[in-house]
Amino acid sequence: MKFGKTFANHRIPEWSSQYVGYKSLKKMIKEITRLQEDIYRAHNKNSYDEGRPPTKMRDSSNSAQNYLDSPKIQKLLASFFFAVDRDIEKVDTFYNSQYAEYKKRFERLLSSNQFNEIKSTLVVDANKEDAVAQTLLTKDTREMNMLLKGTSQASRLSYHKDDLIEIQSILAELRKQFRNLKWYAELNKRAFGKILKKLDKKVGTNQQMSTMKTRILPLQFANDSLITKDLSLLKTIWEQVTFRINSYERVMRSTSPNANANDNTEFFKIICVFIEEDDSKGLIRELTNLYSELSLIPTRIMISVLNKAALSKSLACIDAILKVIPSLNDSEDINRRNFFHHHIIAIGKLIRKQEILSRKKKSQPSKYTNSEGEIVTDLRTLHTTLSAPAESDSITEEEKSSACTLSYILEELPIHLRPCLFQHDNYKRTPLHYSCQYGLSEVTKLIIKLMKEWNIWNEIPIDDVSAFGDAESLTPLHLCVLGAHPKTTEVLLQSLDPNVKLKSSSLLHLATEWNNYPLLHVLLSSKRFDINYQDNELHETPLYLACRLNFFEAAVCLLYNGADLEIREKLFGWTAIFVAAAEGFTDIVKLLIANNANFDIEDEGGWTPMEHAVLRGHLHIADMVQIRDELVTHPHSQLNSGSEEKEPLNEISAGELNERNENGNGGNKGSLGKLAGPIKSYGHRFLDNNESLILITLGSNDTRNKSPSISLSSEALAKVIGLETDCALSLVISCNDSIDKSSVILDLPLDDNVDAVDFKVPFKVDYSHTLYFDIVPTYGTRSLETHNRIDCQKNNNNYVMARGVSMLNKSYSSVGVNRSILNGSVTVPIIANHTLEILGTLKFEYIIITPFEHPQLPLERTETYWKSLVSTRVIGHRGLGKNNPNKSLQIGENTVESFIMAASLGASYVEFDVQLTKDNVPVVYHDFLVAETGVDIPMHELTLEQFLDLNNADKEHIQRGAGHSPHHVNGADTALQKYRGRSVDDSDVSTLRRAWDLHDNDPNGKSNNAHWSDNRMRLTKTFKKNNFKGNARGHSIASSFVTLKELFKKIPANVGFNIECKFPMLDEAEEEELGQIMMEMNHWVDTVLKVVFDNANGRDIIFSSFHPDICIMLSLKQPVIPILFLTEGGSEQMADLRASSLQNGIRFAKKWNLLGIVSAAAPILKAPRLVQVVKSNGLVCVTYGVDNNDPENASIQIEAGVDAVIVDSVLAIRRGLTKKNEK
């Protein structure tokens, strides 16, 4: 997940309209870069026919290629900065307004009489808690004894604890508000830094530093010093108040052993007893005794006693208090709240506490699936299931009885006290606001009923901010929706006149984000909202939002109430089916299709939902939204045609592939235009002989591992770091050996799928490098370039709050010379700087790429070689093709004979798999397990001698076998020897078949030799899975295993090699049960490279591998031989994120300067137009798989612009393509 998604998901819902328009600004940058690319292409056209290397992609670091003096680009830049200025103004205005409001509330608290009365009793130094505790306990005991004796000082103590509890509640709310505002400011500051950095990187400007310095950093929201200071003071007071409350409770328990230790509602037992027994006379008598006269009792005490009596449903006590209480308002109340405010808040907290205590975690069956586990898509069935209110919103007996008691109070209330029910507190909230906030539907119903009876209720929209808005512009209806209270929401809506129209259609978006069916259904059933309302920023409807967030319940409710499925959002012209298909939300896609969503449509870039799903690896979803339009499924490339060039449908920057395929100028459906050819350049920067590269991945590339990369305990942070817990934190990664003495800064919390961090270091044989992971305050210790490197000398102990350290040469246990473990995950503790307590953990993976030396390394390719790389060609898979269990003549896969025949039949390259034996010799073999041994043994556990001798075992058996005369065997061997000595054509097939027929067969047509071979392998994992083994005698024309060096000598020099480096990924090793110990990767790659460079002699060579780290090493160790990244493209489930989809494969290949990708044919066949996505990113596109054995499939791909197809049936595909070209 990149910052764009993190930004959207981390916003505070009620403030969603007040954030930076990040996506809109991002789209504007894409428009600028698209125009730059158009100008660049017009000046630099590729000339493939002349055999010259293709033109490089536009380099934004080259000012001459940015065309910033172009009037069109200057106009777009002016529009961009105008939009940035408007966003800066919006964010700054909102932040200042909210901060002023929260600051005013805090200052009001600190200046209140209640706070001043208890301030002198607070702990001065919270760090001396143990020393002060005894003093306070003694003082509390003395005060409590004075209370019990009826002394005059007891009157103050009687309400101290209530004041403390209220102050604690206010502090908690203020802390939440300040923290939300702080996060709001931090998120927007990051967004500005990110978008300006993206502008500089993509467009080639140099605006981030200057704009941040002059326009953003001087503003208050970009500097958190004031709010951090407020939070620090607030935290100090919070700790002292909490300590004081706990002290009172200890005194109560020590002074009155029979008192209820859990009673937090009264200080003195006797008053509580009178209220609980509803003894009004005793209550009045005790109060009179305490204060001499009723008129001397503070209003605050009277309100507190009335509140307790109401909570206890003590009607007699209520009557007695109402007769003597002078007012329901306490002029000295901190928040200017009256009895009704306090009482409704107390009811809400009491019911919420009961719900928490009674809530039990139960695993309930899914409401969305039937008995077979299939998703239900019928709206009526789903509506019946989902429309029942949640248990948390049901009306409890406590609420009913509380509402009855409140009703009784209101009936007995003198007329002159009625306005108290509608009085505003300091937050501009009435009791109705609080009843809605806590979801008290019965109380809300009662208040509205009385307002109507007393002619106070005005028939105006309940969501009208001017009439009902509080200090934060939240109305009672807003509070109901934000609290997800459907019952209370229904009460509010039913109280309105049918003709009254509501003003806040955006409430549907807020309700959608709760994914609460009953809440949404109540809103929509009222018919007062526009169900298709589009927000102002992105024009997203509630249905689109539900589908983007994968909120099934919300989507069902919206569809049931008639939401339009075909409304498009603003940025890319996507409907709901687009975002659901692109994100891979299977259930949502099924639901939309069942409700007739149109998926045979294109977005603004000309792409269909099917193509978006394929690109992101969701092939099962692509099947659901598959379209049959031949203009999409059989596009025609104009790559080498002489027709007029057309704009491509879409060009995607590799850096943006984690988002959407946003760019796009439209274009005609089915016409790919003149595809941008692969424009990769070689001779790229690689490691010098004295350099290594450390590549660090925070977390894991394994998508099965869901644990966070960094886990910090909030409790430990609060305890150890103290006042700084409310400051923004960053992670600084540094290496002691970094050549440029730099560090990398990442703001916390980390975005998902953070790009790998790298350090170039001096080469050390023992890998003795040390990594530091420091937790530091975000502000005051960094340069203006967010997420860029800073001088590691600044990262000193004055700023480091906590640190984790990893010594890389000690991070794993040694498993042998040139051996390593596959699961390279390291977890280090994060230790506090001063206390040395563990604050959390950090998990990462790393690889160290060491340099490779060879005399032939500076070798350069000719222009003819470039031409061969960009011309469509056929590559023989494992030579002539991989073997299959069909009863037909087959030459053994990965054999010399197979490679020679493939070349003679028209293959430009032959593809084969290379692995290393135990004694470090590269051999040609496909499977990780060598089944020919009769046991499941991996290749790296066999020596070369043992591996090659496996063929001799077969020959010896044949020579000893009964029924096989010497002339039979010798005849076959003679024919095979004749075949091996030269290239072959189709006429050799009959000779080979006759030689094969010399072997005796059993009645079933299977040779005795095959029985012997099968019997030996019958217990191996490979044979059990396939009941077959390639290049096995009896199944194919088997030949001897061969080393990589032998291939260079035996295969004609004009035949190119596509060398697949076969190194297992973690999930592959687990599936094949290979164990965790493998060849050390640098040693593996260096060994293969040495053989290749020793024997290349001008041969065309391409490396390829499914393992991303192997590709990285091959790219960084040498600049000569191009590398292709093999990917399933989503056709198979892969654990490594980089191999999980075509999109991630493109990003990976682009980042590490690879020649291109080799994708499984399935995704390309489903969406052939995606070939241009690959090629517009400067990459070669090659495909493989059994689908390529169909000439029609190969033809479709080649017409779409695929550079090469790897096939098993070389002759058939070549003939098919020839016939196609002739037509």
From Swiss-Prot:
It is found in: Cytoplasm. A divalent metal cation binds at residues 911, 913, 926. It is an enzyme of class 3 (hydrolase). Residues 43-59 have a biased composition (Basic and acidic residues). Disruption phenotype: Affects the glycerophosphocholine metabolism but not the glycerophosphoinositol metabolism. ANK repeats lie at residues 427-456, 472-502, 504-533, 538-567, 572-601, 605-634. It comes from the Eukaryota. Its cofactor is a divalent metal cation. GO terms for cellular component: cytoplasm. Its EC number is 3.1.4.2. Residues 872-1217 form the GP-PDE domain. The modification Phosphoserine is found at residues 653, 983. InterPro entries: Ankyrin_rpt (IPR002110), Ankyrin_rpt-contain_sf (IPR036770), GDPD (IPR051578), GP_PDE_dom (IPR030395), PLC-like_Pdiesterase_TIM-brl (IPR017946), SPX_dom (IPR004331). Residues 1-213 form the SPX domain. It catalyses: sn-glycerol 3-phosphocholine + H2O = sn-glycerol 3-phosphate + choline + H(+); sn-glycero-3-phospho-1D-myo-inositol + H2O = myo-inositol + sn-glycerol 3-phosphate + H(+). Pfam families: Ank_2 (PF12796), C2_GDE1 (PF25329), GDPD (PF03009), SPX (PF03105). GO terms for molecular function: glycerophosphocholine phosphodiesterase activity; glycerophosphoinositol glycerophosphodiesterase activity. Disulfide bonds: none annotated. SUPFAM superfamilies: Ankyrin repeat, PLC-like phosphodiesterases. GO terms for biological process: glycerophospholipid catabolic process. The keyword Lipoprotein does not apply. Belongs to the GDE1 family. Present with 2300 molecules/cell in log phase SD medium. Glycerophosphocholine glycerophosphodiesterase responsible for the hydrolysis of intracellular glycerophosphocholine into glycerol-phosphate and choline. The choline is used for phosphatidyl-choline synthesis. Required for utilization of glycerophosphocholine as phosphate source. May also use glycerophosphoinositol as substrate in vivo. This is Glycerophosphocholine phosphodiesterase GDE1.
